[in-house]
């Protein structure tokens, strides 16, 4: 395994442990595992989306973000991603963008909920819809155990970085 992959895995592991420790004080282990597992899976889907888009757009020399902002490209990449992946994560909802929001202290739980909703909505009417039904339902993002308000909840998750 190359060093960059090992470093990336170690960083992810450290962030997940930090998230677990931040949530541990507010809820039981069986409760916070739902958040951790949901975030791991969202990370996986986001990473897969980014790699897919890099490969899809490499010959066109355009970024995913730029392609998304061009209506013709957007229609084509949405169609391709839904056919090949069964879902699409919009550029603004990529996991790495959320990490930057956390670092900039602009992240909140409501944004994560919008990201998950957009992902789930992308599967509606596709063969993958049934596979995704209820996938993130155990992540109760409106739970007061994450904080009393959206911003406090976001602050609690900010501790993970």
Regions found by a protein language model. Give the residues of each.
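Non-catalytic, mostly N-terminal accessory regions of nucleic-acid modification and defense proteins
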Residues: 1-161
